[in-house]
Structures are given as C-alpha cells and as structure tokens.
Amino acid sequence: MSKRLRELEKQVRALTEEVTRLRPENLALREENLRLAARVAELEERLGQNSRNTSKPPSSDPPSLLPPPPKTGSGRKPGGQPGHRGHQRELVPETDVDEIIPVKPTQCRDCGAALRGEDPAPRRHQVAEIPQIKPRITEYRLHALCCGRCNAVTTASLPQGVPPGAFGPRVVAMVSLLTSFYRLGRRSAAEAMRDLFGLTMSLGSVTACERIASAVLAGPVAQAQAYVKEQGVKQADETSWYEGSARKTVWLWVAFTEQVTVFLIRASRGTDVAKDLLGQGLGVLVTDRWCAYTWWPLKWRQLCWAHLKRHFQAFVEAGGQARRIGGALLVEEKLLFEWWYRVRDGTLARSTLRAYTVALRRRVKALLRRGSVCGHRKTEATCRELLKLEPAMWTFVRLAGVSPTNNASERAIRRGVIWRKLCFGTHSEAGSRFAERMLTVTATLRQQGRGVVDYLTSSIEASLRGERPQSLLPMTAANVA
C-alpha cells in the first residue's frame, strides 16, 4: 500500500512540475491567440471596406460587393408621360441665322394644281453645320535696313501683340484646353489639332503652349485664391496626385465657393497647405474629418454628413453592440436629411428645422457616447473623435447657406482625379502649376457660365499687349478689385 502511495505521490509531483512548466507556455499561446484573432478581425474589416462604409471611391469596390437593392419601380412606362410637355432643341433666333432658304410646295398634294402665295408662319427647320476650318497664316517679314549715314543695320521688331512663337493666342488656348480639361495626352492633342483644324504641331510645341498659358494665368489664379480666402462659406477636399517621372505622390487640394473654385498641388497633405489654401479661419468651412482642418474654429466648421453616414455604416458592419449603435445613428441621419431636403426645397422653415433638431441632437450624442465604450476598437475611436467635434455636426442647422456635405468640392476635384488616372499626373513642378491653374480656370468659368476658350484667348492677347489678363472673379467682385 505504501509503495502504491509513493508511486502516486511521484506521479503527482511530475504532473505538478509539468503544469508549472506548461502554464507560462499556455499563457503565451493564449496571448498569441488573442493577438492573431485581433489581427484576423482587423484584416477582415479591411477587406470589408468599400465606398459605402469608407471614403474609398466606388471604382475601388471589389466585384464581390453586392450591388445596392434595386429601387422600387413606379409602374409607369419609360419615356414621356401623358400630359408631359416634351423637350426639343430650341431654334436659334432669326438674327443669328446665316442663311434662310424658303421652301415652297409647287403643286397641290391632292389634285396637282399649281400653288402660289406666301405662308405667313412657315414651319422652321434649322440645320447646324461647322464649315471646314483652315488656319489663318500671317507672315511678318522683318526687314533689316542699312543706315546711309552711319552704315548701322537695323532690323524691324514684331508689332505689339504679335506672339514671338509660331502659334497665336487661340491656338494656345485650344491646345491648353485639350491637354487639361479634356485630358488628352500631348500626342493626342497634336493629332486633334491636325484632324480638326489642319494645323501640324510637334510635341514640343504643345508643351510650349501649356507653358505660355500657365504664365498668363498665374495672376488671375492668384487673385482667385485671395478671393476664396475671404468668402463666408467654403468647402475643401484633397486627393492624391502624381508628379515626376518616378510618379512621386503629392496632393491635389480644392477649395470650392459659390462662384470661384481654386486648386493647389503640393507635396504635403498637412495643415500648412490647408492654411495656404483657405486663409486664416474666416467664415464657415465644410470638410471631412481629416486632421489638416482641425485648426479651423470649431464653431465655424461643418463636418460632412455623407462621410458620417459611411462611418455609421461601418459601425453596422463591425457587428456586436457597434452594429446596434450604427443602425440607430443611420435612422437619425435619414430623419435629419428628410427635414433638410424640405428646408432646401422651401417647404420647411429653418427655424422649424432648428426646433426639430434639438431632440435629435441629444439622441445622436447619447449614441456616440455609447459607441465610445462599445468594445469595438475602431468604433470607439471614431465615436470619441466625433464627440470632440460634435458641435461641427450641426452648423448647417444654425446658419443659412451652409451645406451639410462637402459634395460640391468632391465633384469639383473629381475632374482632377480622372486627369490623374488617364494622364498619370504631371511630369514636373511646372506641369503641376499648369494643372492647378487650368483646373481653377475651367471650374470657375463653368460655375459663372463664361466661355473658357474666349477667356483664355483674350487673356493671352492682353498679355501680348502688355496688359493685365481678364479677371476670374464674378463681375461685381472684379470691379471692386
């Protein structure tokens, strides 16, 4: 019996030693398992990121992402509805018609009798056509004459307003527009000038046209930048850009106002560039939560609710308590925008919106507090930051003229994004200056309903005469300036 006890005691000691030895190993394995589980969750969450729950563009969505549910049909047939007034091309005023050709029937369609007379209101049919375009070539013969008194030879200079290069202002304007707004490569732009206008150009000539336009636009663009800084409401956004043969990543910035939009291309995405673009905190600024804008006074800042909606959707997809909080926030967001659309359409007074929003704001703040301790790390971090910025979620309710989203600035910068994707950015700093200036000019002129080619042509002509180029500012602001 004692021998059996001694064997059991020996086994117990061995097992105790083994447990003691394995306990740290087990603890280490448990810690490693927790780390790996957290890493897997992080990677799965990253794989689940798309344009609906982050700021990623829809073009980056994977094929596996299910499309949004189809909208419920109205039950009506496609096309114009009964009673709907049709749309058709408007006729050009008779004063702008180049040629009028009367067309009269010669005989009756029933009996064949000859027809005479005038129709006081004939049916008008207009056909627009572009005539064959041929470049107008002007040759300047600069004579060199010898003085009969001192034998000095004097060569004539080009008259004022004549460009020193081979191409005139309108050619420079059109080439610059093709390589910027229409995003053609230099070779394609040269081919377009040959096919459309019968004008042969080298790639070097295309680059020279860009350089001329960029230099002429420097003054008007600087004036537009100063104008934007002084505006009471502006939106801002930024996106990546490529510069140089190595495709170094730099940043394209935009500041949008009601009448003027300006762009900058800079190496940084930081606060210094934001201050250079926007000024010193004057007026209301509508942006996303990017840290470069945190210096702007919170009282005069509006967070973009389109971005907030995507954050709330990310809460839902995180699962657990974050899912319930995100769903509740999406319900509040939908209700808020139903009210906002009515204010925008004029069917709800802003004072009523302010009254409605009081209780909704309390509910949103309570949900964010719950989210800050929900147990999901990213949801907690986002909710804590939103609680710090919470006053900036409601500026559009308080002030007229402020949008709840920065969608206008995102639409403006989208043309730059497409340019970057098609042309791979710019090859030099000079190219970046050309890009930011042409983006500023084309966006601003289109906002104001002004012609881009005519503006560029007149500005280059003014520069050749030694005069200031035409202003980009709205007429009233330009007159003051």
Predicted ranges, named:
Residues 20, 35, 41, 88-91, ...:
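Catalytic center-proximal scaffold of phosphoryl-transfer enzymes
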Residues 1-166, 235-236, 242, 287:
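Short, flexible loop/hinge motifs at secondary-structure junctions
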